[in-house]
Amino acid sequence: MIRLFGLLWPRGDRRVTVIYALLVVFSLALLWSVTEPLVGSYARMRVDVPKTVFWRQVIWVVLSWGTLIVVSRLPLRYLENMSWPIYLVVLVLLAMVMLIGPEVAGSRRWLAVGPMRLQPSEFGKVAMVLLLATWLGRRTEGGSRITATLGSLVLALVPAVLVLREPDLGTSLVFMAVWLGMIFWYGISTLLLLTALSASASAVIMFYSERILEQPWPWAGYLLVLMGILYLLRGSVGASGLILGANIAAGLGIPLVWARLEPYQQDRIISFFDPSRDEFGTAYQAIQSKVAIGSGGLFGTHYLQGTQKGLAFLPERHSDFVFSVAGEELGLLGAGTLLVLFLLLVLRAVDVATEVRRPFASLLAIGVASYFTFHVVVNVAITTGLLPVTGLPLPLISYGGSNLLASSLMVGLLLNLSVHRYDD
């Protein structure tokens, strides 16, 4: 019996496994709640989230647990050697999505596999983390860090661009956010870091100037201030030119990027800055989500008793806005407990990154930490109205087999690293 239990339990840090199990149980409890029958006259005009959603997720949980066990037991060298083949296979799958993937709500994000639908972009995150850890880990000594950084940027951009064309803006941003986390841990040059941060600021200011204020002067003023700072710093002409050129390119690129966004994506971003413009349209999700979380208070309305959820005011309550259900029914204490579990998982990943001896393993652990950090922070920020709605799930919690399986792969990699943390 003990031997059988050992085979059905993943190797590695038991604390990570317990955190994973608690998060999955949390998910199933919330999904059971959102699949309860709706009540009220308004709800009769809405569609229930069927109980099959819960039972499908149970099946995915079983498959994900098996995946967790397998990945935690694989040789670390094998994972490193397979990073390129896995990455290339995922790129092929992403290309297939655009060619033969079924179109749902104007986008192609899935591949039909019998009765199931898989979302290759979710597995692309795992593949990219593996490959970036391999690429950067083999370039920690000798050679140019700038060259290694630019090469890693290309490896992250390829799947990000393919996903953006589906279109799926939220998921494409995950690739870049994880890349930033890993490249920061790797040791990005100060020049590249300043260039990236200032260019990001330039893009945001240009968007706000053009789309919200409809005045060009804030962005022009920003460029003048930047040029003054560069002059006072007395840096090299090449470095100053790189920073200024990147800022101008980022700002001028915003109108081009905006033109390629889908109309619903544009509406969501505009509604974020001005919710009163369309309270019952594009801003509806964010408004109802904030109402749900706010009505929960400290202790919540109690499990299965959420009114925003039960009356169907809260859309996408089983997927992107499941955190709102936790906030409404379980209150600040319940939602806070959920966030603490994620925090413990991320902190453990960072601990592993500092304990392991191989650069590949350290970068891989940081990739896992970056993945969960970005997903959780952005999803919670969306549900609380701090960011525009982008359709990013809460890992291990939201309904969806592909995301659950991909997130379980990430946890499996972390467990594997905890086993081999003292290997050379």
Tell me what each language-model feature is.
Residues 29, 103, 108, 172, ...:
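Gly/Ser/Thr-rich beta-alpha loop segments that engage phosphate groups in nucleotides
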Residues 173, 178-192, 308-330, 393-394, ...:
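Interfacial segments of multi-pass membrane proteins
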Residues 8-10, 148-149, 311-314, 356-357:
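Helix-boundary and loop/linker segments of multi-pass membrane transporters
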Residues 271-319, 330-334:
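TM-adjacent membrane-interface loops and short helices in multi-pass inner/ER membrane proteins
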Residues 1-9, 47:
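Cytosolic juxtamembrane amphipathic/interface segments immediately preceding
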Residues 11-15:
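N-terminal export and membrane-targeting signals
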Residues 1-3, 378-424:
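A juxtamembrane structural motif centered on a specific transmembrane helix
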Residues 17-25, 29-32, 39-281, 327-384, ...:
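Hydrophobic alpha-helical transmembrane segments of multi-pass inner membrane proteins, especially
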